[in-house]
Regions:
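Sec-dependent signal peptide recognition
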Residues: 2-8
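Solvent-exposed helix-loop boundary motif
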Residues: 72-81
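N-terminal, post-signal-peptide region of Sec/Tat-exported proteins
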Residues: 50-70
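The canonical Cys-X-X-Cys-His
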Residues: 32-46, 95, 109-113
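Electrostatic cytochrome c docking/interface patches
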Residues: 17-35
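Axial heme c-ligation environment in periplasmic c-type cytochrome domains
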Residues: 53-59, 81-134
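Hydrophobic h-region of N-terminal signal peptides that target proteins for export
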Residues: 10-18
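Cys/His-rich metal-chelating microdomains
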Residues: 20, 46-49
Length: 137
């Protein structure tokens, strides 16, 4: 009984030592993974490798350094009709809009994708998502 209480106490201490932002980031990653699998993986693949010449990869690309995160948020929400270059290769397939995704969904999805494929592993905050979506072209 004492061992169980000690383990529970250590778990509570471990959890309480993480910052609120880190806990939120971890929650966003989990929710974002579910959103990615539902909304993005059919075209961009579960591993982010894309689909041959049709849909661009998200993993191992220059996209994360070259394109503003606010622009990617707008593309996710409103779709993309124009060609996009990834790793120097043009992709011309139409990306449909995701009108049902709200700012929180975009924040979670972007945080997950950053965690998986971007060198910048920080949270894409709800405020950042709201601002980006408010200012989409």
């Amino acid at each position: 009984m004492i061992n169980k209480l000690a383990i529970l106490g250590l778990m509570i201490i471990g959890i309480s030592c993480e910052s609120r932002e880190e806990i939120t980031r971890q929650q966003y990653v989990v929710e974002g993974m579910n959103l990615y699998q539902t909304n993005c993986a059919n075209c961009h693949q579960v591993d982010g490798s894309g689909l041959k010449d049709l849909y661009p990869p998200l993993a191992r690309t220059d996209l994360w350094q070259r394109v503003k995160m606010s622009e990617l948020a707008c593309i996710i929400k409103h779709g993309q009709k124009d060609s996009i270059q990834v790793n120097g290769k043009p992709y011309n397939a139409y990306m449909p809009a995701n009108p049902k995704l709200q700012a929180l969904d975009i924040a979670e999805l972007m945080t997950y994708m950053r965690e998986k494929w971007s060198p910048n592993k920080t949270i894409f905050s709800l405020d950042s998502a709201r601002y980006a979506l408010k200012n989409c072209p």
